[in-house]
Amino acid sequence: MYNTTNEFLIESAEINLLVTEGLADKSKKMFATVIKKIKEFIRKVLMYIKSKLVNKIKSVDKNIKTAKANETETETLEEPITLANSKKLDELLDSVETVLKTAKEVSLSVAQKYSLLSDSELDEFHDTITNNYETLESLYEKYKDDIDETYTKIPPSIYDAYGKTNRKCSDITGNISECAWRLDDAIKAISDSTDDTIAKRMQIITKTQATITKAITVAEFITNSCNRSITNLY
């Protein structure tokens, strides 16, 4: 089981490398290795969400209740305080939702319409999920070191804003899990195939697992940002 999202990034990179090597030599053995690796990746994703990410989301809710009980929201601050910008957090979440929606649709299509997909359709699927992934990646790179702002007064309804963001994170974990299951279905659909488009399908599947990795990374970043900000308030 993964202990940090960095481990997701490492394994995702390993899968990408294996696929690149497999495409180069068209080795069935290599593709079998990739399929096994992605299946294990899916299992670890589901376990991480259940054992790590869900608990972090619960921790945010708990800390919001504690902060509200201390009634710090109406206090004048003696010193400036650094808090995560809730609008930036929500913008990141919107991008995560978009890329996961695309990933689920693509995985479902690969799994259910295996014999019907043309080369052009596969190319379109790959381009769409790649574009959405790159948009999320760009936004995350933009905000990950610039998510905080300094406040001299506690913003009105800040706890409600973080609570809303945290609930969206909770919904995101469900979307990630669903995406992982659909990816598993797509893997099963190509496992025993000899179709000559398997290389393109494998590229789509690989980009989908990379999307899941990025979604978890961003969701955890948002949850951690909420938690850190709330604990700064009491």
Q: Where are the regions a protein language model picked out?
A:
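Proteolytic processing junctions in secreted/extracellular precursors
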Residues: 2-26, 32
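Long, low-complexity or tandemly repetitive, helically biased scaffold regions used
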Residues: 62-234
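Membrane-interacting alpha-helical segments
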Residues: 24, 28-35, 39, 43-46, ...
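Generic low-complexity, intrinsically disordered sequence content enriched
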Residues: 13, 21-22, 27, 50, ...
